[in-house]
From Swiss-Prot:
One of its GO terms (molecular function) is amino acid binding. InterPro entries: Asp/Orn_carbamoyltranf_P-bd (IPR006132), Asp/Orn_carbamoylTrfase (IPR006130), Asp/Orn_carbamoylTrfase_sf (IPR036901), Asp_carbamoyltransf_Asp/Orn-bd (IPR006131), Orn/put_carbamltrans (IPR002292), OTCase_ArgI (IPR024904). It comes from Mannheimia succiniciproducens (strain KCTC 0769BP / MBEL55E). Pathway: Amino-acid biosynthesis; L-arginine biosynthesis; L-arginine from L-ornithine and carbamoyl phosphate: step 1/3. It catalyses: carbamoyl phosphate + L-ornithine = L-citrulline + phosphate + H(+). It holds the Pfam family OTCace_N. This is Ornithine carbamoyltransferase.
Length: 334
């Protein structure tokens, strides 16, 4: 079946077919090779892209900016302190203004409804840089990284996400694995697993793609024979440390440490993290947490020994954000 990604939004990957996702991954690999070889051709000359950031960012902002510059596009960075968004002007009105000025809009913020409103009213392609529900550009980078670190066909790769799984990472890793026919395990305390209705949507997708989906609180079941172990922070941006007590008690058994990695039974298992990671006390937040919870001084969701080991491929994952974001923009705008 033919497909066309021209002028397409990237909101969650729910509406992207497996073939379209694989095309974006292949394009990202081609663009990455071209950048390394010094043969990249700018295909977005004259394009202008607005980057709306309601949440702070390092990797997403840098990736969008470098990807755009590499391809000859211009960007404007917009944050809540430098615009009228949400103060004097609604997102709907903002969308209708920016859509007349820009060729595409990236949004990183809180509600999925907001990025969908931008897509509905702007009249230009909108790219989701992260919401509370989905993180599609991260998913493309994650799968590209797993492909690069595996000799297996895509549908034979086994990966587990472990920890607080009711967030954008848990949802998105379940969704993209279902779309691509992969062996996906989502593991965490029962109260921190993806919502049942979303799991049902992914299970319906898996019937078409042959994906194997496991959502469980059983760590040994989830990590057995895994090729890749993913995790994410246990606390969201802006949450007070005082609110961590119950969460930490729930999640401590799901911490990624040397023992958990050994429980996979795979000597070649790799560790992945969307970053930033709390793996030591070298940050202000890390020190505050260690002061309140001394048993976490050597790492929270992942321990220092795992993070600083050859198992960790999170920095290649971070680089691949840029290559996959570039692929999304080229496919939609070139």
């Amino acid at each position: 079946m033919p497909f066309n990604l021209k002028n397409r939004h990237l909101l969650s990957l729910v509406n992207h077919s497996p073939r379209e996702i694989k095309y974006l991954l292949d394009l990202a690999r081609d663009l990455k090779r071209a950048k390394y070889a010094g043969t990249e051709q700018p295909r977005l000359k004259g394009k202008n892209i607005a980057l709306i950031f309601e949440k702070t960012s390092t990797r997403t902002r840098c990736s969008f900016e470098i990807a755009a510059y590499d391809q000859g596009a211009n960007v404007t960075y917009i944050d809540p302190t430098s615009s009228q968004i949400g103060h004097k002007e609604s997102m709907k009105d903002t969308a209708r203004v920016l859509g007349r000025l820009y060729d595409a809009i990236e949004y990183r913020g809180y509600k999925q409804e907001t990025v969908e409103e931008l897509a509905k009213f702007s009249g230009v392609p909108v790219f989701n840089g992260l919401t509370d529900e989905f993180h599609p550009t991260q998913m493309l980078a994650d799968v590209l990284t797993m492909i690069e670190h595996s000799t297996k066909p895509l549908n034979e790769i086994k990966y587990v996400y472990i920890g607080d799984a009711r967030n954008n990472m848990g949802n998105s890793l379940l969704l993209i694995g279902a779309k691509l026919g992969m062996d996906v395990r989502i593991c965490g305390p029962k109260s921190l697993l993806p919502e049942e209705n979303f799991v049902s949507i992914c299970e319906e997708i898996s019937k078409e793609t042959g994906a194997r989906l496991t959502v469980t609180d059983d760590i040994d079941l989830a990590v057995k024979d895994a090729d890749f172990v993913h995790t994410d922070v246990w606390v969201s941006m802006g949450e007070p440390i005082e609110a961590w007590g119950e969460r930490i008690n729930l999640l401590m058994p799901y911490q990624v440490n040397t023992d958990l990695m050994k429980r996979t039974g795979n000597p070649n298992v790799k560790f992945m993290h969307c970053l930033p990671a709390f793996h030591n006390c070298e940050t202000k937040v890390g020190r505050e947490i260690a002061a309140a919870y001394p048993n976490l001084a050597n790492g929270i969701e992942v321990t220092e020994d795992v993070f600083e080991s050859p198992m960790n491929i999170a920095f290649e994952q971070a680089e691949n954000r840029m290559h996959t974001i570039k692929a999304v923009m080229v496919a939609s705008l070139a």
